[in-house]
Amino acid sequence: IDRYKNYWEITLKDKKKYQSRSLVLTCPYPQLKKLAKKYLNKKLLNLNVKMHPNITAMLVVKNHKEIPLSSIKTDTDVISWIANENSKKRFRSPLGLWTLQSSVKWANKNINKYKKKTRSTNSFFISEFCKLIGFNKNEVIFSNIHGWKYSYNFKKTVLSSYWDERQSFGVCGDWFLGSKAEDAWSSAFDLYKKIKKNPLIKNKRV
């Protein structure tokens, strides 16, 4: 990412370049500093942000039976949260659809190596789920696992978003405010209000 007189230029891995008058980044804090450190002010650079990883699995279970619950929070070392997707009534399916989220402790231990042993990690995750719910592992007919190295920041920062009208440069993300999906929306809305109040200074050299 480079800033010139009155525009931004982004260079991709394939060397393609894109220019724009304004730039808004929404990415985890460690990646933000790596991409745009020289364009951030001291207040943003000095935020106390600790990002935690998460590993999530999506499962399909045959012989689906109606289960009267929408989600479960657990205190096990491996799984922290289980969602029963069928309970949301967004669609009808004869199959059981589930989403699992790992505990922070287990994700910290496995986030850097799960891709090298995806099959065994996935199998272990499914086994832990079946123990909790009471399913037979053979009933799981599909599963997919994915990890985010920088998934959560549990502590709110002193900022809700960042906007520099001189550079026409903004930043938003859930990590400004917490770990929930709503925090991402709130941060983006806060950035919108800042841009509306202090829009781009046209032709301003920086």
Feature annotation, model-predicted:
Residues K17-S70, F135:
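Central helical "cap/lid" subdomain
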Residues K88-P94, F142-V171, W175-L177:
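FAD-binding beta-loop-beta segment adjacent to the flavin cofactor pocket
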Residues I1-E9:
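A conserved short coil-to-beta-strand element within the FAD-binding core of flavoproteins
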